[in-house]
Curated annotation (Swiss-Prot):
Binds 1 zinc ion per subunit. This is Cysteine--tRNA ligase. It comes from Methylobacillus flagellatus (strain ATCC 51484 / DSM 6875 / VKM B-1610 / KT). ATP binds at K269. It catalyses: tRNA(Cys) + L-cysteine + ATP = L-cysteinyl-tRNA(Cys) + AMP + diphosphate. Gene3D superfamilies: Cysteine-tRNA ligase, C-terminal anti-codon recognition domain, HUPs. NCBIfam families: cysS (TIGR00435). Its EC number is 6.1.1.16. A motif ('HIGH' region) lies at residues 30-40. A motif ('KMSKS' region) lies at residues 266-270. Belongs to the class-I aminoacyl-tRNA synthetase family. It is found in: Cytoplasm. It holds the Pfam family tRNA-synt_1e. Keywords: Aminoacyl-tRNA synthetase, ATP-binding, Cytoplasm, Ligase, Metal-binding, Nucleotide-binding, Protein biosynthesis, Zinc. The gene is cysS.
Length: 455
């Protein structure tokens, strides 16, 4: 039975969908003004894993991940680049989809773009004003009145008094309360705007997700996910907006993945340790990055370093070596089989991927010890639940290096080494082996010939 850690309840809870057999899930996606970074990669991969496991468990899933395509940062970047907002956002949406595909992430069922839902956002703001949860200021902005929502702070576990005392909030004379947040921003010269009952303007960030979630999943749905950094204020504000407008529970299960740290420091541009997905994929195979992300529990902090990526590469190489050169039988997973049952128990326990990985490595050890093709096939099938180990082993082990020798060049050198050995020129053969080793190429001489892989 699946259990999920619910941020709202601060506990693991047995998952019980609103409609038996069906799951509605919304995940906050990217603001598309730049290339996706490692934090985005973690959100993509973690909730892809959740999506895969829910489907494997027999649920019919509707997975929505939004795209924020209007925002202060987007406007600033478009102006800085001298390009239109549409050109900027289209370019980075395409780049985001390329990055996600390389990481083995399945496309969500729906990817709504905020600018296509302005009508729904305006309608929700109108409802909030009618229900006295929001007010129009004299400057054309519309604000949510947080004091009107009695349970504001329930997701973050903070009272309004604590928030007022502890949060640094920009002073705005148009607000009735410093904690009130904007639902609609009055138009500024040179910025895109839409007509509304309060004059031309554009939506605030928080209302976008509330409106898109309700449009596609209804006012009450099963799972809402995102990075831990969104818990407050974004998700807190979503609850206030959605429950204020619709008068019912917004989401049953709130899931938040942990932060990315770089060499045990917070990842940030100011510290100079900020990496895009593309920068990381210049150095590491995309499956290694996916493996690295999933090896940690999704709620734990994830520490990025070259040491940890190298370790992930070695671990994944070990698993692929188990599959290499074997004729694997077609296998439908029997979840009553001991290793499969333990794997399922791990993922049913709040998606405990570290425990699931432990099962994979035990299977690899057993397959290597016994030579069992059935054990190796089960290893591949279970890893497939996580989007791993589905390539031809040689494709991974001999895969294109980010830099250095190509497979054709390696094969040529191996042939030269073989010729040198036949001529008993062992010094030349050793020189070629050493040169390949220096390039990270490991040779394995067998009676059937010489095979190779990247270290």
């Amino acid at each position: 039975m699946l259990k999920i850690y619910n941020t709202l309840a601060r506990a693991k809870q047995t998952f019980s969908p609103i409609i038996p057999g069906k799951v509605s899930m919304y995940v906050c996606g990217m603001t598309v003004y730049d290339y996706c970074h490692l934090g985005h990669a973690r959100v993509m991969v973690v909730f892809d894993m959740v999506n895969r496991w829910l489907r494997s468990s027999g649920y019919e899933v509707t997975y929505v991940r939004n795209i924020t395509d209007i925002d202060d940062k987007i406007i600033a970047r478009a102006n800085e680049n001298g390009e239109t907002i549409n050109a900027l956002t289209d370019r980075f949406i395409a780049a985001m989809n390329e990055d996600a595909a390389r990481l083995g992430v399945w496309r969500p069922d729906l990817e709504p773009r905020a600018t296509d839902y302005i009508h729904e956002m305006i309608a929700m703001i109108v409802a909030l004003i009618e229900k006295h949860h929001a007010y129009a200021a004299d400057n054309g902005d519309v604000y949510y009145a947080v004091s009107s929502f009695a349970s504001y702070g329930k997701l973050s576990g903070k009272s309004l008094e604590d928030l007022r005392a502890g949060e640094r909030v920009e002073v705005d004379a148009h607000k009735r309360d410093p904690m009130d947040f904007v639902l609609w921003k009055a138009a500024k010269p040179g910025e895109p705007s839409w007509d509304s009952p309060w004059g031309p303007g554009r939506p605030g960030w928080h209302i976008e997700c509330s409106a898109m979630g309700a449009r596609h999943l209804g006012p009450h749905f099963d799972i809402h996910g995102g990075g831990q950094d969104l818990q407050f204020p974004h998700h807190e504000n979503e609850i206030a907006q959605s429950e204020g407008a619709h008068g019912c529970t917004f989401v049953n299960y709130w899931m938040h993945n942990g932060f990315i740290r770089v060499d045990d420091e917070k990842m940030s541009k100011s510290l100079g340790n900020f990496f895009t997905i593309r920068e990381v994929l210049e150095k590491y195979d995309a499956e290694v990055v996916r493996f690295f992300i999933l090896r940690a529990h999704y709620r734990s902090p994830l520490n990025y370093s070259s040491h940890h990526l190298d370790d992930a590469k070695q671990a994944l190489t070990r698993l692929y070596n188990t599959l290499r050169g074997r004729e694997l039988p077609q296998l439908d997973i029997d979840w009553r089989q001991p290793e499969a049952e333990r794997f399922k128990q791990a993922l049913d326990d709040d998606f405990n991927t570290p425990e699931a990985f432990a099962v994979l490595f035990e299977l690899a050890s057993e397959a290597n010890r016994t030579g069992s093709a059935v054990q190796a096939a089960l290893l591949k099938a279970l890893a497939g639940q996580l989007g791993l180990l589905q390539r031809d082993p040689d494709e991974f082990l001999k895969g294109e290096a980010v830099a250095g020798l190509s497979p054709d060049e390696i094969e040529r050198l191996i042939a030269e080494r073989l010729a040198a050995r036949k001529c008993k020129n062992f010094a030349e053969a050793d020189r070629i082996r050493d040169a390949l080793t220096a390039q990270g190429i490991i040779l394995e001489d067998t009676p059937q010939g010489t095979s190779w892989r990247r270290s």
